[in-house]
């Protein structure tokens, strides 16, 4: 991984600098003071955490416009304190972050066991460890935004259950 050697760390830093510069450019030329939703996946989750630590948390005028932040697809080790930018606790929360890294039900990566990693169940939008059973899964919207069934219903409802457990999202 990028954390195992100096060239990997350099590559990560170069990528992060591109992201920070692109975000600043967006704010200056395109945002026009509008609200912001941030989303990151996998390695991007690490970049977004760094953007929070090094830029966003130091800029209240920008931070207050961030409605939600999705730190998905990798462990979101808390890069900030709850007072700075909290983990969302229910579906109506704003100005907070959501995070999950999903695995097959029961699987725990050996290097992440017994850690305190923030996690949100994306079916219920709650992080209290309660399971979302198949009947609460509304369905899937495909990336082309097409509905298979008539009436704009989501496809394949009640197909997934999930539970947060020790920093993981277990899915079945």
Model segments located where?
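Surface cap/lid and interfacial helix-loop subdomains adjacent to catalytic sites
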Residues: 20-32, 54-171
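Short, hydrophobic alpha-helix immediately C-terminal to the catalytic nucleophile
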Residues: 49-53
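Active-site catalytic motif of lipid deacylating hydrolases and related acyltransferases
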Residues: 1-35, 172
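Short glycine-rich or small-residue beta-strand-to-loop segments that form or flank ligand, phosphate
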Residues: 37-40, 69-70
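Gly/Ala-rich beta-loop-alpha elbow adjacent to hydrolase catalytic centers
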Residues: 39-48
């Amino acid at each position: 991984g990028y954390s195992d050697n100096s060239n990997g760390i350099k590559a990560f830093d170069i990528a992060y600098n591109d992201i920070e510069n692109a975000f600043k450019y967006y704010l200056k030329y395109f945002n026009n003071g509008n609200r912001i939703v941030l989303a990151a996946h996998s390695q991007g989750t690490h970049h977004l955490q760094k953007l929070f630590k090094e830029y966003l948390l130091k800029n209240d005028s920008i931070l207050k416009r961030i409605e939600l932040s999705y730190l998905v697809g990798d462990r979101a080790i808390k890069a900030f304190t709850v007072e700075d930018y909290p983990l969302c606790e229910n579906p109506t929360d704003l100005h907070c972050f959501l995070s999950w890294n999903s695995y097959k039900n029961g699987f725990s990566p050996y290097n992440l066991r017994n850690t305190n990693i923030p996690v949100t169940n994306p079916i219920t939008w709650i992080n209290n460890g309660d399971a979302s059973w198949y009947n609460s899964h509304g369905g899937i919207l495909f990336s082309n935004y097409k509905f298979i069934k008539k009436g704009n219903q989501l496809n394949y409802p009640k197909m997934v259950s999930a539970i947060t457990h020790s920093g993981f999202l277990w899915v079945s």
